[in-house]
Amino acid sequence: MKLNPVLNKYTNAPLSLSLKRLQECSARSFELASPAPPEINHSVDFYNHEQNRIFNQEWICIGRCDEIPTAGDFLTHDIAGTSVLIVRQESNAIMGFINACAHRFTCLTSEKLGHAFAFTCPNHAWTYGINGQLNHAPFMEMKSSFNKNDNNLERLHTEVWEGFIYVTLSKNPKKGIAESLEMLSKNIVGQYDMTDYKTIIRESMNWNANWKNLIENFTESYHVPIAHPKTFANHKKRIQDYECGEDSEHYCYHFAPQESENGPGAAHKDNKNLKGKWRRTMVDFCIFPNHLVTLMPDYLWWVSVMPKGVGEFKATWGVAVPQDILNDIAEEDHDNWVMEKIEYMNTANEEDRELVERLHQGSQSIRLPKGAYHPIEKNLWQFMKYLTKITA
């Protein structure tokens, strides 16, 4: 569904009004709560504010460690208009840099994934090692005050958690991502051993909606039996069995077991980590602000959502599977098997796209009812409380 950008009564809502409305909504208990105010999904002032408070400051997931397994492997990602470059080092560490030459700030590479022994600026051939140090700057000896050591790439803070790579544009992040997510790992997702999952797909998509519309769609499974008849509904999880996790400033999650203990959605027979109901349980979680994961015993699907405007976002997504699942796929069948996974996920994405774009369209209406939450939509309320605090 293609939506044309439109001006509505919320477009020019002043930041003060959006913040006030958000504060009022999030102050209510979950039992009395209503959905987030439409201003925060349509106001240009609020959009600019969240770019500064959220995407220029918070930890952002940009991919998986196994996507860059070898020294010199790299990936790039755009965060709020800033291109970042993530490179595997000789030491096996992962380092992050601003993807801009230290001379006059030309982007060093436009490749999304690649391998390099050095990065050479296409403008004036300044050349950097994979550690970001300037190795060569043609004819700069003509300037007596020039010092190569003062002209390295701008370094970024990076961290790895459960096989995911996170980066922040903040010079002084308040808290590390691993520390923030310690209890989520310990109590819920650590038992799945996500570091053992191997990436088989990395794609991206652009949708015509506010980025928060997708966060809300992903963090509730109330819609799944109705909206996903060709995909996720087939796992047959009962709405009554969903449980929402504890309140946290850093994440939210919900989980439910599927009906079958075998086949798609269930653990491989060689999986020794998962016990009891967890061998057939899905966990949907969001690492605030924009990292979404559906975690199952036989695969995970991750999404990193990046706004491109009030009514448009880009979502980078990938699929990874445990090694024991891969071991059962014959080499000659691998490509067809991956294509089937891509087709399945594309179908699921299309099922969601119309919902998300309709949500954005409907919420710009000049008159709206109060709205309400279903009991298994608590994650939306938790996300709203995070937004309230981070944008205050």
State where each predicted segment sits.
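C-terminal catalytic domain of Rieske-type non-heme iron oxygenases
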Residues: K2-P5, A93, N99, E159, ...
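Rieske [2Fe-2S] iron-sulfur-binding domain
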Residues: E67-K171, K175-E182
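N-terminal pre-ligand scaffold of iron-sulfur
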Residues: K2-A100, R104-E111, H157-E159
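Short Pro/Gly-enriched beta-strand edge/turn motifs at strand-loop
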Residues: N56-I68, A137-E141, F285-P289
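N-terminal short leaders/motifs
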Residues: L15-V44, T106-P122, E154-V160, F232-G265
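Short, flexible segments with low predicted structural confidence
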Residues: S18-S26, G129-I130, L184-N187, G276-K277
